[in-house]
């Protein structure tokens, strides 16, 4: 029960972060908002790590892979923050939910895992769901929708690398290095895009980092009490929080096509999660 509560709390915290990012995107560059997410997350995470978990931290056995992982997540964050600056939170997140499908599709190549016909069918059906949301040929495809889809693709590869690192590196170190890599890279472009924030905007930028930090902390705590495969279906609670925030604060509500695509993608993701759990039990 603890695992479920922590997991659901994470999927409440992270959409709040997205809401702040969407609000700020009306006045600040997407890259600056992304910088705030990384800078303040690292600022809050560093002291916690070294005060309470320093004895568990040792240098990575795969530093190059850690760098690639951090770079991929940074790209995913930029794509997502750009997408929500243009389209609704719910539509952007729905398209980003293709991430588990990417993991399943590429795990035979990068992780050496065997994927059966049933899971391949679920992957194909899930991608059909993403096409239902985008509706190519029926409506004009905008860059924001493609960026949201790109978020899911990049996040899928991020999850694959996370699995590879889980066998060698401490997850707390992985979390810290991911933030540091992203913060260093995004800071390099700040002199070229920086817009001076107001005091209110500074507080919201800090809030993005705080909610990101708390959200990921809850995720780590949830994984302490239960396997990721068992918790995977609860991640779709994030879309409910996103819809509520989008409707209440931005007057955005998903259309019928988005709901249909979401339904298809979520069912595919849950089916894949259940099949993976069954396969592990058989082994």
Placement of each model-derived feature along the sequence:
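C-terminal transmembrane-helix exit sites in multi-pass transporters
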Residues: 99-121, 193, 240-259
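Hydrophobic transmembrane alpha-helices of multi-pass small-molecule transport proteins
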Residues: 118-134, 257-276
């Amino acid at each position: 029960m603890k695992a479920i509560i922590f997991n659901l709390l994470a999927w409440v915290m992270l959409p709040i972060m997205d809401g702040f990012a969407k609000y700020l995107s009306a006045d600040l560059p997407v890259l600056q908002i992304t910088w705030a997410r990384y800078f303040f997350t690292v600022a809050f995470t560093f002291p916690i790590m070294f005060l309470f978990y320093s004895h568990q931290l040792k240098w990575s056995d795969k530093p190059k892979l850690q760098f690639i992982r951090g770079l991929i997540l940074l790209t995913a964050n930029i794509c997502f923050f750009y997408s929500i600056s243009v389209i609704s939170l719910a539509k952007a997140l729905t398209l980003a939910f293709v991430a588990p499908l990417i993991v399943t599709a590429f795990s035979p190549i990068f992780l050496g895992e065997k994927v059966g016909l049933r899971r391949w069918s679920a992957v194909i059906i899930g991608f059909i769901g993403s096409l239902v949301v985008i509706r190519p040929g029926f409506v004009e495809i905008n860059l924001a929708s493609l960026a949201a889809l790109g978020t899911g693709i990049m996040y899928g590869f991020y999850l694959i690398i996370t699995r590879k690192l889980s066998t060698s590196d401490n997850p707390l170190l992985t979390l810290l290095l991911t933030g540091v890599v992203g913060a260093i890279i995004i800071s390099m472009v700040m002199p070229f895009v920086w817009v001076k924030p107001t005091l209110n905007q500074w507080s919201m930028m800090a809030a993005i980092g705080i909610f990101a930090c708390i959200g990921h902390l809850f995720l780590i705590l949830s994984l302490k009490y239960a396997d990721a495969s068992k918790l995977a279906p609860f991640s779709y609670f994030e879309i409910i929080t996103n819809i509520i925030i989008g409707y209440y604060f931005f007057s955005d509500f998903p259309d019928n096509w988005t709901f249909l695509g979401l339904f298809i993608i979520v069912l595919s993701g849950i089916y894949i999660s259940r099949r993976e759990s069954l396969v592990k039990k058989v082994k």
